[in-house]
Swiss-Prot record:
This is ATP-dependent dethiobiotin synthetase BioD. The gene is bioD. NCBIfam families: bioD (TIGR00347). One of its GO terms (cellular component) is cytosol. Pathway: Cofactor biosynthesis; biotin biosynthesis; biotin from 7,8-diaminononanoate: step 1/2. Homodimer. The keyword ATP-binding applies. Its cofactor is Mg(2+). Gene3D superfamilies: P-loop containing nucleotide triphosphate hydrolases. One of its GO terms (biological process) is biotin biosynthetic process. Its main location: cytoplasm.
Length: 239
């Protein structure tokens, strides 16, 4: 029996489409014949429906996955206020514990062929006084896919984040260019620069380039991703 795959999805910043790209990846994995599940271990920003607290990002992931996980497994830490998680957690009396997340991930791997773990914010977002999302990626021991929001400043943000991923001893399995600013000048040149630098310095392939979409359509975006290349990269990283 083939061991399950898993990937940690991070971004160059907040609001650059991590959830959108994660959902597109889930659709792509499903089309590839894989049972795909999602974890959003820490979510900040909740709304109540029928007496149940929910999160919009987690809802999007649930809609894209073809393996449904119980909410308490998919998102063990659901914070109500939409702000920096360590600040909200302290206000709400919640301790964001990495061991709990690792245990949830371990259980998710028993239920799916591939588990997409979406981080929160950028690569180094504090979770408590001493640990951040980079520590979470290390604790999970996962290869990373970097979502680059293609807008002014994205080259530096992409290269700095890639370096931070490597400094933690993690593999950058690939990256996705997500065009968040449809009016950006020299978008093609920016993407080409990032592609060349990440290939040379990290051997990280461009998994896909997603055009600006209004409204966002993860199922359509899945066709813009090279899922076969991503699966191979994840398998190589696991060896």
């Amino acid at each position: 029996m083939t061991a399950p795959l898993s990937v940690f999805v991070t971004g160059t910043d907040t609001e650059i489409g991590k959830t959108f790209v994660s959902a597109a990846m889930l659709h792509g994995f499903a089309r590839h014949g894989l049972r795909a599940a999602a974890l959003k271990p820490v979510a900040a920003g909740a709304y109540e429906r029928d007496g149940v607290w929910r999160n919009e990002d987690a809802d999007q992931l649930d809609a894209a996955a073809n393996v449904a996980l119980p909410p308490e497994l998919r998102t063990p830490f659901l914070l109500k206020a939409p702000a920096a998680p360590h600040i909200v957690a302290a206000q709400e009396g919640v301790t964001l514990d990495l061991d709990t997340i690792v245990a949830c991930h371990r259980e998710a791997l028993t239920r799916a062929d591939v588990v997409v773990v979406e981080g929160v914010g950028g690569f180094r977002v504090p979770l408590n006084d001493t640990q951040d999302t980079a520590d979470l990626a290390v604790a999970l021991g996962l290869p990373v896919v970097l979502v680059v929001g293609v807008r002014l400043g994205c080259i530096s943000h992409a290269l700095l984040t890639a370096d931070a991923i490597r400094q933690r001893g993690l593999t950058l399995a690939g990256w996705v260019a997500n065009h968040v600013d449809p009016a950006m000048s020299f978008a093609d040149e920016n993407v080409a620069t990032i592609r060349d630098w990440l290939a040379r310095e990290h051997r990280a392939p461009l998994i896909g380039r997603i055009a600006h979409m209004t409204p966002a359509a993860p199922e359509s975006a899945a066709a813009m991703l090279d899922i076969a290349a991503l699966v191979e990269s994840l398998r190589t990283a696991r060896r």
